[in-house]
Amino acid sequence: MRVKNAVNAKKKRKKIMKAVKGYRGALSRRYRLAKQAYIKAKKHAYVGRKLKKRDYRKLWITRINIAARNEGLKYNELIHGLKISGININRKMLAELAVNDPESFKEYVNIAKQAIGK
């Protein structure tokens, strides 16, 4: 008995070819190359999602550090002071305050200074 799977095979190929529409050259026309390009693109997308988290954290830390140094405190001293005083604010929110609301950020810096005795 022969295997009849034309519908599913066509559906699978169509899905790949639709996904690689817009790729350059043979990558958008030839199935074998298109499949390889699709797999590689998905791999890069996965890695990119992981890198994005790291990049944003780095950006937040840089922003906090710059704002803290303007107030006479280093980044690590600020974070340590906030931890001692029991303030649980994440780096994203702290960076947001540093950029958009410097007065509130200054209050956090003062709390951290008091906690570490500076």
From Swiss-Prot:
Keyword annotations from UniProtKB, A to Z: Ribonucleoprotein, Ribosomal protein, RNA-binding, rRNA-binding
Family annotation (PROSITE patterns): RIBOSOMAL_L20
GO molecular function, one term: structural constituent of ribosome
One GO cellular component, as annotated: ribosome
Keyword Ribosomal protein applies: yes
Family under the similarity heading: Belongs to the bacterial ribosomal protein bL20 family.
SUPFAM superfamilies: Ribosomal protein L20
Alphabetical list of NCBIfam families matching this protein: rplT_bact (TIGR01032)
Native source species: Thermosipho melanesiensis (strain DSM 12029 / CIP 104789 / BI429)
Gene3D superfamilies: 6.10.160.10, Ribosomal protein L20
This protein's encoding gene: rplT
HAMAP family: Ribosomal_bL20
Purpose of the protein: Binds directly to 23S ribosomal RNA and is necessary for the in vitro assembly process of the 50S ribosomal subunit. It is not involved in the protein synthesizing functions of that subunit.
Any single biological process term in GO: translation
Protein name in the entry: Large ribosomal subunit protein bL20
